[in-house]
Amino acid sequence: VPPGFTPFRQ
């Protein structure tokens, strides 16, 4: 997971 990437925010 890249820094700053949030899979929870869509």
From Swiss-Prot:
GO terms for molecular function: toxin activity. Keywords: Amphibian defense peptide, G-protein coupled receptor impairing toxin, Hydroxylation, Secreted, Toxin, Vasoactive, Vasodilator. GO terms for cellular component: extracellular region. Signal peptide: none annotated. The modification 4-hydroxyproline is found at residue 2. Produces in vitro relaxation of rat arterial smooth muscle and constriction of intestinal smooth muscle. May target bradykinin receptors (BDKRB). Belongs to the bradykinin-related peptide family. This is [Val1,Hyp2,Thr6]-bradykinyl-Gln. It comes from Pithecopus hypochondrialis.
